[in-house]
């Protein structure tokens, strides 16, 4: 993540409106929860930051700029389902499904600031000198129906936990992630300060599945009780993209800051209960 200390004097208090409804079912062998939600964020304060390069008297200068924005809105709505089934005493089956539709809406406005906190007039080192003309350099960021990035909007999971012996537990979990969008990008290469910027819908990162295996065994160790357990995460070493920043063409070829997920990982634990 990135941070900025540039002051946003136009920032407003964010407002949140949320509605949620759900239903739960309970029985000896089956438990389930169904939930629906809608949340609206109003006047969210956002920022975008990157580096710029320019020349001053034939000397190369590199600086960082920040675009402070206010007035953006976001709508999140969706459904969630989770359940636990216990068909036999020695087996549990768990599952979940979540589908959401999360989008930015509205027009955010803001100024570009250099690293010194000065309002920029261009990307070549120019700064505003007469605040009476500040409105000429205010950017308007149109964000209608732009998918929120950074988190999968469709997820599912299915797990089986078996206890073949009294002190032995083995679990296998399947996890599915889809409709994860890259974070939106504001392309300054074709943007003039003070003009409207239209944000395109970002690249949809390919969906993927992973499997996790875990096991645990409890036993007596002298006069104390001990448990040996371990996990193998991403059992089949699935390659996948976890996060990215959108590019000019809204596809994998132009995406930047692409982060791949972890491959297969292991851990082993030994616990003593006194």
Write out the residue ranges for each language-model feature:
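Flexible, solvent-exposed coil segments and beta strand-coil junctions
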Residues: 1-5, 54-64, 127-141, 188-197, ...
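Outer-membrane beta-barrel translocator domains and adjoining extracellular loop/strand segments
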Residues: 1-3, 45-51, 100, 105-112, ...
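Outer-membrane beta-barrel signature, preferentially recognizing the C-terminal barrel domain
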Residues: 1-41, 58-86, 148-154, 204-206, ...
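Conserved C-terminal beta-signal and adjacent last beta-strands/turns
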Residues: 17, 135-137, 145-274
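N-terminal/domain-start segments enriched in small and hydrophobic, helix-friendly residues
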Residues: 28-30, 47, 217
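Secondary-structure boundary/capping signal
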Residues: 29-31, 91, 168-169, 223
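Gram-negative outer-membrane beta-barrel transporters
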Residues: 38-40, 61-186, 271-273
């Amino acid at each position: 993540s990135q941070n900025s200390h540039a002051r946003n004097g136009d920032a407003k208090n964010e407002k949140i409106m949320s509605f949620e409804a759900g239903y739960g079912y309970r029985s000896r062998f089956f438990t389930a929860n169904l939930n629906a939600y809608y949340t609206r964020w109003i006047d969210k304060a956002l920022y975008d930051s990157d580096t710029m390069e320019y020349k001053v008297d034939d000397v190369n200068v590199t600086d960082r700029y920040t675009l402070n924005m206010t007035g953006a809105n976001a709508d999140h709505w969706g459904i969630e389902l989770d359940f636990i089934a216990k068909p036999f005493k020695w087996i549990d089956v768990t599952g979940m499904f979540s589908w959401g539709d999360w989008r930015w809406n509205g027009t955010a406005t803001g100024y570009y600031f250099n690293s010194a906190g000065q309002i920029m007039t261009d990307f070549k080192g120019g700064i505003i000198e007469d605040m009476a003309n500040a409105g000429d350099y205010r950017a308007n960021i149109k964000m209608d129906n732009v998918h929120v990035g950074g988190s999968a909007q469709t997820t599912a999971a299915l797990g089986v936990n078996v206890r073949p012996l009294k002190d032995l537990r083995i679990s296998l979990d399947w996890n599915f992630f889809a409709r994860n969008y890259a974070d939106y990008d504001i392309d300054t290469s074709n943007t003039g300060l003070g003009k409207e910027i239209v944000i395109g819908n970002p690249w949809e990162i390919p969906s993927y599945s992973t499997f996790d295996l875990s096991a645990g065994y409890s036993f007596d160790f002298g006069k104390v009780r001990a448990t040996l357990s371990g996990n193998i995460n991403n059992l089949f070493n699935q390659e996948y993209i976890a996060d990215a920043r959108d590019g000019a063409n809204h596809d994998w070829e132009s995406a930047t800051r692409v982060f791949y997920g972890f491959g297969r990982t292991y851990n082993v634990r030994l616990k003593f209960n006194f």
